[in-house]
Amino acid sequence: MKASLLALLLPAVSARNVNLAGDTQRPMTHEEAAAATYHIEISPGNTRWVTEDEKWALRRKGINFFDITDHPDLGATINTLVGPPKKKAVFPKKPTYQDAVKPLFTNLSKSHLEENLEKFTSFHTRYYKSDWGRQSSEWLLGKVQETIKEAGAEKYVTAKHFKHPWGQNSIIATIPGKTNQTVVIGAHQDSINLFLPSILAAPGADDDGSGTVTILEALRVILQSKDIVKGKHPNTLEFHWYSAEEGGLLGSQAIFSAYEKERRDVKAMLQQDMTGFITRTIQAGLPESVGVIVDFVDPKLTEFIKKIITEYCDIPFVETKCGYACSDHASASKAGYPSAFVIESAFEYSDNHIHTTDDLIKYLSFDHMIQHAKLTLAFAYELAFADFPALEKGK
């Protein structure tokens, strides 16, 4: 790359917003961006200050982290005496709503998954600081709202942005239950090219376009249950699409920080991040499977998810690990909420095209994504109707 071209690109690569009087913003100059530092946590209690370029260098090395600059106190109330103590997580011993859930599976659609993913990957990038990232979030919110309206559920179900200062907002769809006990299903909507995030294409088909459309499809189908739409279930369901996961779990930290401060009663959170790539698993001579993350997760919730997969999916699960702060479930966990994470395969066989221009639909299996949609749908329905107070009393 010629030096003159590099000089033109650097300001765009490092651009960040600066707050001015009256809540207006302007991009940072290159000098300001070069001087900006971020406080990150790469393992529990192991923090350091880095520049933005150093953040991306760590990610290129496969090192994940929380960017705790704006939320250094996430999880601070867990061990305090403020408010009632958190109850231990308890989940059903086995799935019990097969008669309601399995008939819904016939409505899951590969064509819906593909159509939505084609559109979602058509944005040049979904980098959270880019205007494309803002546009993709606006499109996604519109699609979620359209899904709710087509189900005739707009009187009961809501979808709205959770706003962030960097431009790309997170999205929360809420299906109210009889109580504020809440079950969360999440995916992240942003994508990134780790070499020139503000400039190079980042279609993000698998990471995490696949998870985004997977939980959208699960939402579409669960809204075909009249009992769910009319709120006959005791527990509230929320579907989250997080912004800025790639920047250090920024969007999910903001949401779960707010929930922690509000003392929201989140009973369970499941993250779907990368749900479509099976090529390396098959090439290794291994069976197609769902990867169940077993490190830095809630073990009881994870055991329940294994039972969901065994009961409702057509393929087995494999236990795997992904390390600290590897996706948005980590924000829920840090805030004190039981969280779990499933991925497309054993971690070592997951998609090797991510974070580049080559994270494309052509490498993905929509049949495999349907398995993740079945898991998501069953998980949501089973826990929507779970009697958590009785479970916590040992009944």
Curated annotation (Swiss-Prot):
Signal peptide: 1-15
Disulfide-bond pairs as recorded: C322-C326
Keywords, alphabetical: Aminopeptidase, Disulfide bond, Glycoprotein, Hydrolase, Metal-binding, Protease, Secreted, Signal, Zinc, Zymogen
Molecular function GO labels: aminopeptidase activity; metal ion binding; metalloexopeptidase activity
Requisite cofactors: Zn(2+)
Known EC number: 3.4.11.-
Domain of life: Eukaryota
Family membership noted in the UniProt record: Belongs to the peptidase M28 family. M28E subfamily.
Protein species of origin: Podospora anserina (strain S / ATCC MYA-4624 / DSM 980 / FGSC 10383)
The protein's name: Leucine aminopeptidase 1
